[in-house]
Amino acid sequence: MSSDRIFIFDTTLRDGEQVPGCQLNTVEKIQVAKALEELGVDVIEAGFPVSSPGDFNSVVEISKAVTWPTICALTRAVERDIDVAAEALKYAKHKRIHTGIGTSDSHIRYKFNSTREEILERAVRAVKYAKKYVEDVEFYAEDAGRTDNEYLARVVEAAIRAGATVVNIPDTTGYCLPSEYAAKIKYLVDNVDGIDKAVISTHCHNDLGMATANTMSGLLAGARQCEVTVNGVGEHAGNTALEEIAMIIKSHSDIPLVTNINTTRITPVSRMVSNLMNMPVQANKAIVGRNAFAHSSGIHQDGVLKNVSTYEIIDPKEVGIDDNDIVLTARSGHAALKYRLEVLGIKMEGHKLDAFYDEFLKLADKKKQVSDDDLLVLAGADRAEDHHVKLEYLQVTSGKGLRPIASVGLDIAGEKFEAASRGNGPVDAAINALKIIIRRQMVIKEFTIQNITKGSDDVGKVHMQVEHDGHVYYGFGADTDIVTASVEAFIDCINKFRG
């Protein structure tokens, strides 16, 4: 293996999924894991098994479904955590336990009420215990970014002696400057006995907008694994974006580093994750934002028309953007639809494809041409098929000088309900009618509308945050009619608190 090979450790399904409203079910996690395998990631952190039965089951099922990437499970430096992680990983072809503890003075004092020596001993015990189950053990020094280098080196050296094969140096708070983070990695390379027996890993957060810069600085200083997420999803301001690291390394031929990433799968995987997590990608997001390869300035447009290299350093096709997309219409057949779905990373066969095709035709009759983004939205709506509460019909009457009135019909576990109500607008009227049926005090805390496609017949996607009985639920809906999309988003929230 080349010493310049960078291992891509994807934590979209663990760290990325901690974003409020972005939780996935097991089937969706398997779908993402398979897409990550096709993308070429080396390690998939599938979850934190001890945290919930759902996380445990997801790690088990992903271990069964994925073939060549290493499947990793997170633990604390607690024996029960490690026991549960090992059980969850029993079907994995290649398995890793990721255990560790906070090492900064802040964590030692306030989180653990402990001492440096006690933390070091707990770290060693955890690694040794994990080695009883698996050969591949990764140790993380949480908040390493704010841990002084001398103590950090002691902990890392002890972890390697105990058997750690990877040592993770997280900038947990996103505080480090790139020069500081690089110096920290270099200090470990130069001062830890046995550092050649383990891989140093970066794990950078984006609280100050430096996650990608810090990760690259760490790699250039000697780290050979980086922990990333698709689209940079993650708590707070997010994590290092996989697509940014992959394309920086590929674009800079003078950087002597390589990854195993199939970059032509970047855009399809980005769209899949965005759709499944209901997390829109900002338009100006590097590599995968919809404006990443757009040019509105006249000077830029003129240059690009003469030669694309004047303003574009990446060929869009390198990241999976195909200028020759098949145009889907109501006359498109099953084969064309199936092909387009597979390009987007969505696998459908048999009856499921037939049912999806019927929904596709309904949208195609409304829109004339159906885009990739439309298909992703439709696939997201298709996931609601097992919900207890379903919209049967919606009728709204409104106009200038009229107070809107909405009539709504719901199917709740097979039983039909109807209600009508007025409101301060068509959406308000429809939501009021829903509240009459469900008889719950649900307060909308956030309401955002995103245009998915262009044109007067575009699909609108509504993201909604609703509070009920002290708990917050997130929902989304999509339709060419924004009132219907809003109602579907509210119903999505209802299903989540009922489920």
Predicted segments, located by residue:
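Alpha/beta enzyme core
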Residues: 6-8, 18-43, 56-65, 79-200, ...
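Short, small-residue-enriched loops and turns at beta-alpha junctions
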Residues: 15, 19-20, 48-53, 104-106, ...
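Non-catalytic terminal/interface segments that mediate subunit docking, oligomerization
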Residues: 18, 23, 31-32, 368-485
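Short beta-alpha connecting loops at secondary-structure transitions
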Residues: 170-172, 227-235, 250-259, 320-326, ...
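A mid-to-C-terminal "edge-of-domain" accessory segment
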Residues: 5-6, 12, 247, 253-420, ...
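Catalytic alpha/beta core domains of metabolic enzymes, predominantly
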Residues: 176, 182-306
